[in-house]
Amino acid sequence: MKNILKYIIPVCIIFTLSGYVNAQDEISPERKKAIDSLALEKVRDLSKYISIIGDKATDQAEASRVMDRAEELFVEEAEIGVSSLNREQVNYYKVRQYLMRLNQLNYDKVMIKWYNIHYISDLERQPDGKYVGVITVYQRFEGISDDGLTYKDTTKKDITIYVEKKKTQIRGRIIEFWDVLLGDIRVTETTS
């Protein structure tokens, strides 16, 4: 009996502590509201960065600086989808490659506007402790060349959102916080 108790008690303690740790990683409704707000803010920031990078009036040094800022919003291996009314296939590029291609488009004037930005799926906890959600945006693209040719489309895009608990040290104290990063941006629909 003593041998059984010797094993059962530590197992019970481990399960109790793991439940406590798990509870620490749950997101309260108030915290979720703040995280949702931060995620939407990061998507709006990306929208501004894309407009600046695509704008032909932006000098290359500024475009490069903004590309760096935009890249910081994403998880490491994220990809962004590119579609066209002229083809059915959607091409996917790593974030930096997408931003560089955007900056080098063969139009004399480029206007990109994101609108109707909203969550389509609530944050769901994953087995690794991260939370994942999806935000949808609509992107209006217009490219105009000097000879008067214009290309316009509207693309519906789904952006994967990752939320994870991180730690940082401030004045010798370890501080935990929830961070939001953007994942893949998938094209779901392209119309004229």
Model-based region annotation:
Residues 96-147:
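Surface-exposed, charged secondary-structure patches
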Residues 63-111:
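Short solvent-exposed beta->alpha transition segments
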Residues 141-192:
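Glycine-rich, aromatic-bearing surface loops/beta-hairpins
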